[in-house]
A protein has these predicted regions:
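Glycine- and charged-residue-rich phosphate/anionic-cofactor binding loop of Rossmann-like
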Residues: 68, 348-365
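Predominantly a Rossmann-like dinucleotide-binding segment in NAD(P)-dependent oxidoreductases
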Residues: 154-161, 166-258
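Conserved SAM-binding strand-loop segment of SAM-dependent methyltransferases
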Residues: 89-96
Length: 390
């Protein structure tokens, strides 16, 4: 195959897969487990946002036995119609603001453009509804982070959950099971990487993806520490960026004044350990999310490697495979995570408990990236990272 054909094939693949991760559907499920319903109640859900990758319909709310999708919305009529068709829903609204006036809706999935996430989630919560949101929680704005945080705390009894897909990657799930059982001890070193090559701007509402700072979209990589350790956080960071050769990552050519196509952060963790978290938009090659963890009593990279036989025996008693989902709900994309995120949000409401990726987890992943980008703009200056508890 000639170089021209290889290049053409690569370009075609990029067109067919504009967003990385949607073709990654394999996952490790405990085949002996059986899903047991928590209730026969159906939560009435509204979904907002269809977008470039049909995201509002991608997490399976329409297929969950405890959900009735009663209304959908997108600002563009053709996309709204597509979302309604995918969700098998007849009622549509022209905007999120109109949808949340519907008193029959109990919960809303916000799958809108990233800059709108905090404002939209605040509006949903203030309308008296639970909210699940696509990543990231906020868009480069610390004030928005604190405002969202205070709104969630003020609206006790309503759930906020961020749908970070790495949470249910096989490796992150397995590490979390071992960590929460006390098998690993403290986490010494974590790595998370998110690679998504786009040599040209991807479409986005009002151009929000144009030249976006890599560490403003940090949660896929940061989850390899935060979600692997059940919610621990980062305390300080030194981050470096690479000034990209691509025109849309020239500071004068994008709305963020961002010169970087790749940013790599070295962070101190709340356990006293270290984490290296990378996000890259301008390096060709394999794309997706990956990571690894090294702890006091063992390491996990595709498999668990214990320090000794005693730890190995203890680990053998922990089920590190994901449990069964409702038979009608597929695990979905991004490492078989979509269905699990949907199910966790639904069951957290049914059981009146906090969801797994609550506001603290969400902001501890997102804000660390915001500070990392600030550090990169200051040539790696070490900066403190705010931490959130809930």
């Amino acid at each position: 195959m000639g170089a021209g054909m290889l290049a053409a094939g690569g370009a075609l693949a990029a067109q067919e897969k504009p967003i990385a991760g949607f073709d990654q559907t394999e996952t490790d499920i405990d085949e002996s487990s059986v899903w047991e319903p928590k209730s026969d109640r159906k939560i009435r859900v509204g979904i907002v946002g269809y977008g470039l990758c049909h995201f509002g319909a991608a997490f399976g709310f329409q297929d969950h036995p405890n959900v009735e999708v009663v209304a959908v919305s997108d600002l563009f009529p053709d996309r709204c119609a597509g979302l309604a068709a995918d969700c098998r829903c007849e009622k549509t609204y022209e905007s999120l603001e109109e949808l949340i006036k519907d008193d029959s809706i109990e919960a809303v999935f916000v799958a809108t453009d990233a800059p709108s996430h905090p404002d939209h989630c605040i509006k949903v919560l203030e309308s008296g509804k639970h909210v699940a949101c696509a990543v990231p929680a906020v868009w480069g704005d610390l004030d928005a982070a604190y405002k969202l945080y205070e709104t969630v705390k003020k609206n006790a009894g309503l759930n906020y959950m961020m749908f970070e897909t790495s949470t249910y990657h096989d490796a992150v799930y397995a590490t979390r099971q071992l960590y929460n059982a006390g098998i690993l001890g403290n986490m010494i070193y974590s790595e998370g990487e998110y690679y998504h090559h786009f040599p040209e701007n991807l479409p986005g509402y009002r151009g929000w993806r144009d030249g976006l700072p890599p560490q403003w979209y940090p949660t896929h990589s940061n989850a390899y520490y935060v979600c692997a350790t059940g919610g621990h956080s980062f305390t300080e960071v030194s981050c470096y960026g690479y000034k990209s050769r691509y025109p849309h990552f020239q500071a004068e050519n994008n709305p963020y004044g961002n010169p970087f196509g790749t940013e790599v952060a070295l962070m101190r963790t709340s356990e006293g350990g270290m984490a290296r978290m990378a996000v890259s938009w301008d390096t060709p090659g394999w794309g997706g999310e990956v990571g690894r963890n090294r702890a006091e009593k063992g390491s996990f990279w595709n498999r668990f490697e214990p320090v000794d036989a005693t730890v190995a025996e203890a680990a053998s008693k922990i089920n590190i495979k994901k449990p069964a989902l409702p038979p009608t709900l597929a695990p979905g994309s991004h490492g078989g995570s979509h269905g699990y995120l949907c199910n966790e949000f639904v069951e957290s409401i049914l059981e009146n408990r906090k969801p797994l990726v609550d506001i603290a987890w969400a902001l501890n992943m997102t804000v660390a990236g915001i500070i990392s980008h600030q550090s990169a703009l200051k040539d790696g200056e070490k900066l403190a990272i705010p931490q959130f508890e809930f």
